[in-house]
Amino acid sequence: VHLSGEEKAAVTALWGKVKVEEVGGEALGRLLVVYPWTQRFFDSFGDLSSASAVMSNPKVKAHGKKVLDSFSEGLQHLDSLKGTFAKLSELHCDKLHVDPENFRLLGNVLVCVLARHFGKEFTPQVQAAYQKVVAGVATALAHKYH
């Protein structure tokens, strides 16, 4: 992902304030609620029968944190996202058979959740930088798909 120095600084500064567990759980939960077909990949998570069940599900929260921990790792390697996410791409492609479009959807949901959490601090410039990052991560995660 090509970010200007200013964009990298904005992404890094905001990310330092992100509560990964809270934001990750909310982002994954919102994905599962807004795009219910994505729930099929999470059969082992138990009750996903309603928005409140999804949003309060401890397995959703835990996996959301795991997702954002990986995203955090990606932020450390913006110039080599394909390499950073190669194993996860392979896992999601070959073993889990996740539609790569879901990565884009989750990235967009994450941007919305960040905007909700940070309000005025999430300026149009910060949003634009994050849109570049989530698009780059989605592309990297889709890399192993044929």
Swiss-Prot record:
Residues 2-146 form the Globin domain. Keywords: Acetylation, Heme, Iron, Metal-binding, Oxygen transport, Phosphoprotein, S-nitrosylation, Transport. This is Hemoglobin subunit beta. SUPFAM superfamilies: Globin-like (SSF46458). Gene3D superfamilies: Globins. GO terms for molecular function: haptoglobin binding; heme binding; hemoglobin alpha binding; metal ion binding; organic acid binding; oxygen binding; oxygen carrier activity; peroxidase activity. The gene is HBB. The lineage of its organism: Eukaryota, Metazoa, Chordata, Craniata, Vertebrata. The modification Phosphothreonine is found at residue 12. Heme b binds at residues 63, 92. Belongs to the globin family. The modification N6-acetyllysine is found at residues 59, 82, 144. The keyword Membrane does not apply. Heterotetramer of two alpha chains and two beta chains. The modification N-acetylvaline is found at residue 1. Involved in oxygen transport from the lung to the various peripheral tissues. The modification Phosphoserine is found at residue 44. The modification S-nitrosocysteine is found at residue 93. GO terms for cellular component: blood microparticle; haptoglobin-hemoglobin complex; hemoglobin complex. InterPro entries: Globin, Globin-like_sf, Globin/Proto, Hemoglobin_b, Hemoglobin_oxygen_transport. It comes from Rousettus aegyptiacus. One of its GO terms (biological process) is hydrogen peroxide catabolic process. Red blood cells.
